[in-house]
Design a protein with these regions (language model features):
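Detector for C-terminal structural segments
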Residues: 5-19, 38-155
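Short, well-ordered beta-strand elements
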Residues: 1-5, 28-31, 48
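A local structural motif
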Residues: 18-33, 90
Length: 155
């Protein structure tokens, strides 16, 4: 299991290795690499299993589902499925939100069935926000708050 250097990644790799050993009887070799080496290994496909993460750049299913298209540079699993690619292309060309949602649902069903990836956890950030601070974007997928959007109300 290849992972990049960070204490949180090491903990996750150890937890996965222990779980796979207990539940599957699998012997897992952990490989820790510094960021540049890790990126080289990831890009060249020199791994059997890799710990990776992704954060959406924008609030749309394509920000995640597009990663597994055959031609996407972020497709570390080297997943290739013509039906999946066709659904992504149709969704990209559709202007109808309901149709796009249906197409993305179908694409996601293919990912779930073929399992080229195994989502394990999701990063979270806790916030304590005073009730008189308004404009904080609670559902922002980038987890970014711009001061120009924030304002105070009388309390």
């Amino acid at each position: 299991l290849l992972y990049n250097t960070a204490e949180v990644h090491k903990k996750m790799a150890l937890a996965i290795a222990n779980l796979w050993k207990q539940k599957l009887g699998a012997r897992v070799e952990l490989t820790n690499q510094e960021w540049k080496t890790y990126l080289d290994s990831r890009q060249s496909g020199q791994f059997e299993v890799i710990r990776s993460s992704w954060v959406a750049d924008y609030n749309d299913p394509s920000a995640f589902l597009g990663l597994w298209g055959s031609g996407h540079s972020g497709n570390m699993a080297r997943f290739a499925n013509p039906a999946y690619d066709k659904l992504l292309a149709q969704a990209a060309n559709s202007q109808d939100p309901a149709e796009r949602a249906r197409l993305f649902d179908e694409a996601e069903a293919i990912l779930q069935k073929e399992a080229p990836i195994a989502p394990i956890y999701q990063y979270t950030n806790a916030r304590l926000i005073k009730p008189w601070l308004k404009g904080y974007p609670i559902n922002n997928p980038e987890d970014v708050a711009y001061s120009r959007q924030l304002y105070l109300v009388k309390h």
